[in-house]
Amino acid sequence: MKRFMAIVSYDGTNFCGFQVQKDVRTVQGMFEQALERILKQRVITIAAGRTDTGVHANGQIVCFDCYLDIDEESMKNAMNANLPDDIYVRKVVEVDKNFHPRFDAKRRIYHYLIYNSQEPNLFIRNYAWWFPYKLNICKMREAAKFFEGEHDFRSFMKSGDHRENTVRTIYRVRVLQLRGGIILIRVEGRSFLRRMVRNMVGALVKVGVGEWKPEDISRVLELKDRSKAAVTAPPHGLYLYAVDF
């Protein structure tokens, strides 16, 4: 028996998130159906992260066991032949039988795209958050520094989530001005709470429009109260960019 790790990209627009659910279209559901056609048996997959409805991925990691005598390139080709056109397997690698994509991950990198322009761009409306009000990039960069390091991110978790351990370590947050009015927010950390990155982006935008000062990020972190933080940024601007092991 082999264990394969697949590096997967997908357009999350027409998926109800990654995790398999009954009677709705999910990335994991499509992935497992493709594997079952190839392997002729039920297959359970494990991923590095569970993206929400509308969230995209460039480098999601999906792991599964295979009883066929098949090489990596042949498995990649077989999977892409059986997957819909909004999922693409970029690479397949054989890994140790004890490898676990969630627990062995050392770093997860998320990208969030904002289209900062007075006029919308219809061709990227599913792939970036259109924000028509001017954003102060320098202030957003200053604010981003307050997220770095180990903090209790209870103020930036999903509302209604009652998990006890909400302490997370953020390695780096970068705010980059790209061409064409695109702002890229890059967040790196080992693990994240649900909606955490989108809530962080919402806070940075609040700083960008001048409603908060950069140091208000630190104040809200200390409050440990989701109701005191900013609104959640929409899902379609978020990408699981890469996972490092």
UniProtKB/Swiss-Prot annotation:
Binding positions (substrate): 110
EC number(s) on file: 5.4.99.12
Any GO molecular function: tRNA pseudouridine(38-40) synthase activity
Catalytic activity: uridine(38/39/40) in tRNA = pseudouridine(38/39/40) in tRNA
Domain of life: Bacteria
Location of the active site: 52 (nucleophile)
Alphabetic keyword roster: Isomerase, tRNA processing
Keyword Isomerase: yes
Thylakoid as UniProt keyword: no
One Pfam family per UniProt: PseudoU_synth_1
GO process terms (BP): tRNA pseudouridine synthesis
Role summary: Formation of pseudouridine at positions 38, 39 and 40 in the anticodon stem and loop of transfer RNAs.
Record-stated family: Belongs to the tRNA pseudouridine synthase TruA family.
Quaternary organization: Homodimer.
Cited PANTHER family: PSEUDOURIDYLATE SYNTHASE, TRNA PSEUDOURIDINE SYNTHASE-LIKE 1
Protein name stated in the entry: tRNA pseudouridine synthase A
